[in-house]
Amino acid sequence: MISENYNLFPEKIYKKDNEIYFFVNDDKYVMREYVKKSGIDELLQLSNEMYEKTKGNSSVLIPGVGNNYVYEYKRKKYILIKVNSIERNILLDDIIYLTRSKSDNDSTTKNLEKYKKQIDDIETKLLEFNKEYPKIQQSIDYFIGLSENGIQLLGKLSREEKNQNEGTIIAKIENIDEYNNEELNNPLNMEKNDYELALANYIKYRIYLLHVDYDEMENIFRNDKINHLKLYAYLLYQNYYLSDIVKITRNKKEEKIIKKYIDNRKKYLDFLLYYAEKAKINMK
């Protein structure tokens, strides 16, 4: 379908998670299922804005036959993206740069319900196993404990901010791995959600894969638009670890992928203590 619809002739096609990708003349293309609620015109506008903002370093949508951007195959819709990304690590400025304001947001409440369900589902699923996943058994209580503290704090904030918080369009980092640099500049990875969530996910990315630049972190405390208590709550919730647990129990990933979370527990705790002190957060 790729050659017929896009006039591209890759020698080999690869699959990763729920997408396929291939190379033509050293250019990388990614095909994903299109499940966005927003219309294609809105997505194209966002793509063009990102391309201009990043000076040509964001991924772009590729039209097919008849200048159609959405391709239907076996009752599903797909979009083809050409990857234009700098081969470097993601920076805090990237997250700030791509954030766009949007009103009428209830993301905190939606995230709260999503997180509660995720933990319930994981705890239920793990009852099916005995000694199959020793690394999970050794670490799950610790990470769920942190996450439940985050849920408790988000619940308090959700009640206090009902119909008051301003929403944003943020860049979403879906996975913590060394191959996700291109995710940031992909228009399909922009979503309506809390700005603090984007910042928390960026910090997790730095802790688990790289190192924390504390000079860079000072910029967060200079931004008076950030709700530091909410950011702290999102830091407590271990979304990447828990998402990987789900994938492991579904045989989509190997258990060894959670090693980075286990090995960096002290580094993560040190950052939580640093952030709580800087933001004057008292959980007692």
Regions found by a protein language model. Name each.
Residues 180-226:
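Active-site Asp-x-Gly
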Residues 26-107:
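ATP-binding pocket architecture of kinase catalytic cores
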Residues 1-26, 37-38:
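ATP-binding glycine-rich phosphate-binding loop
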Residues 61, 154-199:
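Active-site acidic catalytic loop and adjacent metal/ATP-binding pocket
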Residues 25-28, 180-182:
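Active-site beta-strand-loop-beta-strand hairpin of nuclease catalytic cores
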Residues 242-284:
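ATP/Mg2+ or Mg2+-diphosphate-binding catalytic cores
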Residues 34, 109-171, 215-219, 275, ...:
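ATP-dependent phospho-/nucleotidyl transfer catalytic cores
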Residues 73-89, 120-130, 237-260:
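A glycine-centered beta->alpha junction motif in the catalytic cores
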